[in-house]
C-alpha cells in the first residue's frame, strides 16, 4: 500500500462501487462459468475505474496509461496483480511526479493490487533490453487512456528493438528453469496451475514467442500459419479454457490470489466443476485426473510448437544426418524424424519402433515435432489389433530388454500416451492420485520411478548410491523380469480390491501374450503378488525371531526370488517419496536379506546357534578394544537370549564396553553416538527399571524434536532396563556427533527427576494429513506363544504421537519390551511388544484400546 493520506469519502465510495461490481461478476461466474467473459469483464471494469481516476487527477493528454502483462492481454484473473505503465513523453517537469503518485495511490484505494512503473519510451526500451521479464510484459502492452501518438511511438520503437531469435532463446531457457523448480513434471500432487509444467505459463510462453516472431498471437493464427493443425488448435483452446477456469475458481474459492491447487482446496474446486464423489473415487481425484491429462496434453503440444517455431526462426543449415530405418525414420538435427506424415498409418508397427530407435541410437536426443505430431494424431491406429500384433509385442519386449535407455524410453512413451495405449490397464492409472499419505507421485509416475530406480542399480555411474543393490543386480540374470514386475506391481491401484492380486492377473496375461514362460513368468507374477511382503516383514515383524525368518524364507523359496524381491522392495520404497526412504529402513531390509539368504543356503535359524555366533563375534571385537577377558560376564549373565538376538555383534560389543563397569549403577547411564548406519543417533539408556521409564524417555525425545525410528527394550535379570533407541532430527540439518553429549546429559538429568509425566504436546498436523485424515486403528492381541501382547497402531503422523501412546501404557503399568516405529510419509504404523500382568483381562484390553484411540485422535 502506498504511503499517501487516508482515503477520502469519495475514494471509499469508489472502492465500494468497484467491489460491488466485481462481486456481481464473480457471482455470475460461480453460476455460469465462462472464464473468457469473466476475465474480459474484469479487465474492462478495471479499465473504466482507472480512466475515472486518471481524469480526476487531471493528468495531461501528453501521457499514456498502458496495461501490460495479463492485464494488457485483457485477461485479468479475479485476484491477479494489475500491471500498468505510466508512459511519459521524453521531457516532463518534476511537478508531474506528484500528480502521478496521487493517481497510483488512488488506484490502490480502489482495492487493486497495482504493479506500476513510470517510464519514458527510451527507458522502456532500455529496461526491456536488459530484462526479458520486462520485455515480455511490454509485448502485450495495451493503451487504456492518454496519448495515442505516444503509445504508437512506443510500439514502433519496441518492435524495432525486439530480436525474435534472442527472445525465443531467452524464453525457452526461462521455461526450462521454471520446469526444473517443479522437478520437470506436471504430476505434483499440489500443482501450480499457472507455473507448473503443462500449466498456463507454458501456453503463454508459446504465444509470446510466436507473437514476438510475427507468427500470430492466437491458436487460430498459428493454425493458419501452419505451425499447428486445426485439431491441435482445438485441443490447445480446450485445455487452455480448462486451466483458466480452474485458476479463476481457485481465486474465487480462496478469496485471494491462489494459483497452487493445494489439498485444502481440491475438493471445493472439484465440486465447483460438478464432480461428485463415488465409491471408487473422491471428487478431488476426478478433478486432479482431468488436470493431469490437460497438463500432459499441453506438455506434448508445447514441445511440438516450440520445435516448429525454432525451425522457422533458425532454419537448419544441414538436413538429414542419417537414415535410421528405410522408408520410416531419419535422424535430423539430433532428432528422430519420420520420412513423411503417413509412416504410422502405412506401418503401425513403426510406432513402437520409434521408441526402440530413440532408445538404441546414439546421438538421438528426442523425437522431432513432426514425429510427435504424427504420434499424437495416430491414437486411432493404436487399437486392439495393433496391441495384439506379434511384431509390436516383440518390439515392446526389445525395448524392455535393452542394456540402456529404458527409463527414458518409457517416460517418453508415457508422455506421448503410447504406453497407455499399448497397456490399457496402465492408461487407467495415468494421473491417478494416491491418498495414502506417503506416495507423493501419481500411480503412473510412481511406477516409472520404481522402474528408474531398478535401472539405476545396473548403471555403473550410479553404483556408489546403493552398492549392495548394484552388486546384486550385476549378478542377476535377465534383469528385464524386474522391469516387467515394476510395471505391474501397482497397475491395479484404484480398481477396488487387493491391487496385488488384481495386478497378478494382469502380469500373468502380459507374460502369456509376450511369450514369457517358465521361471521368468512365475517370478514376475510372484513379485507382483508379494511386492509388499519384504517391507512388511522387515518393518513390522521381529526379525530377531527365528520363526519369523523361517516363515519368510518359506515364502521366498530360493535365492533368485529373494534377490528379486529385495531389489524391487528397495526401488519401490525409494519411489514413494524422497522422505520415506532412510538408511535405517535400508539396514532393516539388508539384514533381512542376509539372514534369509543364510537360511536358504542351509543355515539353521535356531536361536541357540545364532546366539553363540553373535557372542563369539562380539567377544572378538571386545578383545580388539582391549576389554579384559571375562569382564563381559557381569553384564551378559544378566541378559536374556532376546537381547543377543535383537542386536548384531558390533552393537553388543559397544554396549558391553560402555556398561561392563556399571552393571549395578545407582544412577542412569546414558550414552549416545552417531548411528553406525548413518543419518541418525543411537541412544543407550541403562537404569533401574520402572513402569514409566519408556514414556519418560519418549517425553524427552518429544520435547527436543527427536523422532524415534526404532526402540529395542530389554530388562535384565536383576531389574535394570537396557533400552536402545535410534532417533533422528528431521526439522533441520544436524551433525549427530555434535549433539550426542548434550543428549546424554539432558536425558540423564531428566531420568534422575521424580516429576510426573508431562501432558503430551499435540503438534500440528501437516496440510496433507488435515485434508486426508486416516481413521486411527489400534489392535491388541497375544503373540503366538502367549508370552507377550502385540499392539499395532495406525494413525496420522504428528509430533508427540509416540509419547502419547507411551504415556497411556505407563498409566496402566504396562511394560514395553520392544517397539518398531514405522513412519510412512504422513502416516505411522507402529508395533509394540508389551508385557503386563493385567493384559489378559478383556475389560482392561477394551479400556486400553479406547484410551489409546483417544490419545492418537487428531
UniProtKB/Swiss-Prot annotation:
Gene3D superfamilies: 3.30.70.260, Hypothetical protein af1432, Nucleotidyltransferases domain 2. InterPro entries: ACT-like_dom_sf, ACT_dom, HD/PDEase_dom, HD_domain, NT_sf, PII_UdlTrfase/GS_AdlTrfase, Polymerase_NTP_transf_dom, UTase/UR. Keywords: Hydrolase, Magnesium, Multifunctional enzyme, Nucleotidyltransferase, Repeat, Transferase. Its cofactor is Mg(2+). It comes from the Bacteria. SUPFAM superfamilies: ACT-like, HD-domain/PDEase-like, Nucleotidyltransferase, Nucleotidyltransferase substrate binding subunit/domain. Its EC number is 2.7.7.59, 3.1.4.-. Residues 1-324 are annotated as: Uridylyltransferase. Uridylyltransferase (UTase) activity is inhibited by glutamine, while glutamine activates uridylyl-removing (UR) activity. Residues 325-681 are annotated as: Uridylyl-removing. Residues 682-763, 790-858 form the ACT domain. Residues 443-565 form the HD domain. GO terms for molecular function: [protein-PII] uridylyltransferase activity; phosphoric diester hydrolase activity. One of its GO terms (biological process) is regulation of nitrogen utilization. Pfam families: GlnD_UR_UTase, HD, NTP_transf_2. It catalyses: [protein-PII]-L-tyrosine + UTP = [protein-PII]-uridylyl-L-tyrosine + diphosphate; [protein-PII]-uridylyl-L-tyrosine + H2O = [protein-PII]-L-tyrosine + UMP + H(+). HAMAP family: PII_uridylyl_transf. Has four distinct domains: an N-terminal nucleotidyltransferase (NT) domain responsible for UTase activity, a central HD domain that encodes UR activity, and two C-terminal ACT domains that seem to have a role in glutamine sensing. Belongs to the GlnD family. Modifies, by uridylylation and deuridylylation, the PII regulatory proteins (GlnB and homologs), in response to the nitrogen status of the cell that GlnD senses through the glutamine level. Under low glutamine levels, catalyzes the conversion of the PII proteins and UTP to PII-UMP and PPi, while under higher glutamine levels, GlnD hydrolyzes PII-UMP to PII and UMP (deuridylylation). Thus, controls uridylylation state and activity of the PII proteins, and plays an important role in the regulation of nitrogen assimilation and metabolism. This is Bifunctional uridylyltransferase/uridylyl-removing enzyme. It comes from Burkholderia orbicola (strain MC0-3). The lineage of its organism: Bacteria, Pseudomonadati, Pseudomonadota, Betaproteobacteria, Burkholderiales.
